Amino acid sequence: MDNLKTSVHEIYLSLSGEGISTGIPTIFVRMAGCSLRCGMTVGRKLWCDTPYALSPKAGEEMSVNQVLDKIQELSAVNIQILLTGGEPLEGRNREFSITLGNEIFRIRNSSGFYPRPRVETNGAESIEGMDQFVFTLDYKLPGSGMEDRMNLKNLEIYKERKNPLDEIKFVIRDKNDFERCLEIIEKHALVGNLLASPVQGELSPEILAEWIKYSLGSGLRLSIQTHKYIWGDQRGV
């Protein structure tokens, strides 16, 4: 596993900031490289909160063993591991993430504590056949300009997995996005952990909360990026 490498932007210990694992101590493994440019529609700005990790060259070449060593250095006990980016399932990151996930699962499976790493993925890359992971699966809405890149088969795989730790995240820019989110949930009969998160600086949490309050039966829950309330735009915390 020393020969298999990818570009890793950063590895650090913090608290999970959003979704069902909010507040849980977590080791973040951020890989470099993502081909999506969310929010960059006509006359509007990129909203990605990690633009510094979009380039595949925005990191240090690391092997699977080096990443495992860094994880062990950060925490001697088993805590949640989150593979994020960039996009951990795109390009060469994909094979790297699968190999890393398999090794973490092999090491941790007997302990019973967080044996499966969580993968934050943008919805464009397939999640098929990856039982060694739990997923935070994005679905990009019209306001992102990236909805045509979504792999719709992932929604069916999400349902088939029936993993209570999996979640689908919808990032909401405006009312049109919210209505489209409700359409997707109904059309694909989605249940489970369905998260709605506002685009920071473009939609207030208060407004999104009101919309969710009156979308009874959708199964949506509000998800706020709590790490931004604690640390602002600081990186690696």
UniProtKB/Swiss-Prot annotation:
The enzyme's E.C. designation: 4.3.99.3
State where [4Fe-4S] cluster binds.
C34, C38, C48
Positions annotated to bind S-adenosyl-L-methionine: G86
Residue spans making up a coiled coil are: none
Per UniProt, the enzyme's principal EC class comes to lyase
| PROSITE patterns, per database record | RADICAL_SAM
Reaction(s) catalyzed by this protein?
Answer: 6-carboxy-5,6,7,8-tetrahydropterin + H(+) = 7-carboxy-7-deazaguanine + NH4(+)
Q: How is the cofactor bound?
A: Binds 1 [4Fe-4S] cluster. The cluster is coordinated with 3 cysteines and an exchangeable S-adenosyl-L-methionine.
> Origin, by domain of life?
Bacteria
Question: Which residues are recorded as binding substrate?
Answer: L15, S16, G17, R30, T84
Which positions does UniProt annotate for Mg(2+) binding?
Answer: T50
Going by the UniProt record, its keywords in alphabetical order are: 4Fe-4S, Iron, Iron-sulfur, Lyase, Magnesium, Metal-binding, Queuosine biosynthesis, S-adenosyl-L-methionine
Gene Ontology terms, MF aspect? 4 iron, 4 sulfur cluster binding; carbon-nitrogen lyase activity; magnesium ion binding; S-adenosyl-L-methionine binding
> What cofactor does this one take?
[4Fe-4S] cluster; S-adenosyl-L-methionine; Mg(2+)
Tell me the route in metabolism or biology where this protein functions: Purine metabolism; 7-cyano-7-deazaguanine biosynthesis
Q: Which residues form the Radical SAM core domain?
A: 21-233
GO biological process: one example: queuosine biosynthetic process
UniProt record similarity statement: Belongs to the radical SAM superfamily. 7-carboxy-7-deazaguanine synthase family.
What this chain does, per the entry, is described as: Catalyzes the complex heterocyclic radical-mediated conversion of 6-carboxy-5,6,7,8-tetrahydropterin (CPH4) to 7-carboxy-7-deazaguanine (CDG), a step common to the biosynthetic pathways of all 7-deazapurine-containing compounds.
Its assembly, as annotated, is:
Homodimer.
- Please report the name of this protein according to its UniProt entry: 7-carboxy-7-deazaguanine synthase
**What organism does the record attribute this protein to?**
Leptospira interrogans serogroup Icterohaemorrhagiae serovar Lai (strain 56601)
Q: Which gene encodes it?
A: queE
